[in-house]
Amino acid sequence: MRKVFPRPEILGRLYFCGFDVVSEQYIHDRYCVIAQKKRQPSQEQHRYGLLIRLRRIGKDGNKFNVFKFRTMYAYSEYLQTYVYENNDLDVGGKFNDDYRVTEWGHFLRKTWLDELPMFINMFKGQMKLVGVRPLSQQYYDLYTPELQQLRIKTKPGLLPPFYVDMPDTLEEIQESERKYLEAYLEHPFRTDWKYFWKIVGNILFKGKRSK
């Protein structure tokens, strides 16, 4: 019995197996990919059910598994660099035209339901309620070295300063996070208390959402 794989999973499986995609094209209504072997296959093991674990950078630079409801096709996490190089970033720091997200995933993200499992990380002491979002290695590498070091001084959070400042560009996102982190390191409780109520107010009463 033949199984049809969606495009993101095809590309993700190639990167998982150590290939880099050179080009994609349709030839006589057939989807074709040219790829080049670059490295050894990943040794990571995955279960692509409803609940997934994503490797993120936490306090002191330690990597941990963030729990989320799956919103993307299987193996999509291996396409971050490829999507960034070909699509760049959209307003708000998200990938432009991110075809890795499923139709159901768009709904989960719009309603924030995909992030509910991150309370598991908070209960495990890996995250806190307010703080900068835990980043993948690929996205973390886009930040300035100064902000990278500042970020790993604290635990990441569920409610980011993004919803206070609503920055558009990567530079503005970094400035928003820098402002929060510097304030937090000086006055931890006061800063998180102030940011929490600003975030809640902006989301509930001003309708602010990630773009």
For each feature predicted by the language model, list its residue ranges:
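Short alpha-helix
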Residues: 1-18
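Aromatic-acidic/polar surface patches that form glycan- and anion
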Residues: 2-3, 93-100, 108-109, 186-189
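Conserved glycosyltransferase catalytic-site signature
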Residues: 7-8, 28-30, 101, 113
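A hydrophobic, helix-centered structural microdomain
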Residues: 16, 22-79, 189-211
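Hydrophobic structural segments characteristic of membrane proteins
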Residues: 43-44, 117-211
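Short, glycine-rich, amphipathic interfacial segments at transmembrane boundaries or analogous
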Residues: 54-99, 159-179
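Short, well-ordered beta-strand elements within core beta-sheets of diverse protein domains
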Residues: 55, 104-110, 182-184
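Short, conserved beta-strand/loop elements in beta-sheet-dominated catalytic cores
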Residues: 100-125
